[in-house]
Structures are given as structure tokens and as C-alpha cells.
């Protein structure tokens, strides 16, 4: 293991357009090949589609969607005496948010639709209504943790 100091965690600055740290994190997750302006346009278009369809504030709906997709527990593999157990562990808030954003982007890309902004808008609206693939993934993660509760004492 490295003896050097741990890297300092840089603070995430809020996105200038939406004044939201979550939006800034989402842009980073959407970005491919360093094309940040394209990712910003995708998020901006998705937010305008959401506002158009719901008539509400898109940023608030986005924050609700992320909250609904954020897992509270996860299972991690732990090897004990030749056997590998799925050990349920609590998820730190930062990691939970990162997982939710990653799932939202992944399942948006897998959706049927014309443009990425339309697919992202659809996934965000579904997640805000507690439906959609990202929320299903969270529920599956929670079910796995519940099923493996017996191995919780192997926590590290």
C-alpha cells in the first residue's frame, strides 16, 4: 500500500447555468471524450424538455430524481476462509449520489429515443416518479442487501 498522503478531495463547484452542484456532477458523468460543452447542451436540453412537459422547475425534479435513485445500502464481496460472502454495507452520501448519477446516465443511454437529451429527460422524469430503471436498480441493490443481512457481521 502507498505511504504517500491521500489525495485531497476537490470541492465540486456549482454549475453556472443552473447554480447546482448536482447538475455540475451530472455534466461530468455525461461527458464523453472531454466534450464538456456537448454534455452541458444535453443537460440543458433535457431540463427544457422536462420544464415543457411538467410545467415545473426542472432542477428541483432532477434533484428529486437523484434522491429517489440514491441507494442507502449495497453489498460488497468479502472473502472469509475460502468462501466469498456478499456483505451488506451502508453507502456514504457522496458515493450514493455518484452511483445514482452513474445509473441515471447508463440507463438513459440504454433507452429508446431520438436524442440523448430526450432519453435523459425521460429517465429523470421516471426516476422522479419512482419508476424507471435507475430506481429499479436501487431497489434491487436494497433487496440484495436485505437477502444477505445474515452476513452483516463480516463488515469491515
Swiss-Prot record:
Keyword Ribonucleoprotein: yes
Domain of life: Bacteria
Any one Gene Ontology molecular-function term assigned to this protein's record: tRNA binding
CDD domains assigned: uS7_Bacteria
InterPro entries assigned to the protein according to its UniProt record, in alphabetical order: Ribosomal_uS7, Ribosomal_uS7_bac/org-type, Ribosomal_uS7_CS, Ribosomal_uS7_dom, Ribosomal_uS7_dom_sf
GO cellular component labels: small ribosomal subunit
Pfam families reported in the protein's UniProt record: Ribosomal_S7
Coiled coil: none
Listed PROSITE patterns: RIBOSOMAL_S7
UniProt-recorded name of the protein: Small ribosomal subunit protein uS7
Organism encoding this protein: Prochlorococcus marinus (strain MIT 9515)
Classification lineage: Bacteria, Bacillati, Cyanobacteriota, Cyanophyceae, Synechococcales
